C-alpha cells in the first residue's frame, strides 16, 4: 500500500510540472550554443594543440 501512495504522490508531482513547447526550448538551446560556442568545449571541441587524445604526428623520411 505504501508503494501505491508513493507512486501516486510522484505522479501528482509530475502532473503539476509546467511544460514548454519543444519548438520554443529548441530555439533557446540553439541561441545558447551559438552565444557560448567559443568557450564551450562540448560545442567547439578542444584546440588541437591541447588535445591529449590526438594522435602524435611523427616525421617519416622516405
From Swiss-Prot:
InterPro entries for this protein: G-protein_gamma-like_dom, GGL_sf, Gprotein-gamma
GO CC term (a single one): heterotrimeric G-protein complex
Propeptide: 60-62
Keyword check for Metal-binding: no
Annotated keywords: Cell membrane, Lipoprotein, Membrane, Methylation, Prenylation, Transducer
GO-annotated molecular function: G-protein beta-subunit binding
SMART domains in the cross-refs: G_gamma, GGL
Subcellular location per the Swiss-Prot or TrEMBL entry: Cell membrane
Subunit structure, as described in the record: G proteins are composed of 3 units, alpha, beta and gamma. Interacts with gpb-1 and gpb-2.
Family designation: Belongs to the G protein gamma family.
Protein's UniProt name: Guanine nucleotide-binding protein subunit gamma
Organism: Caenorhabditis briggsae
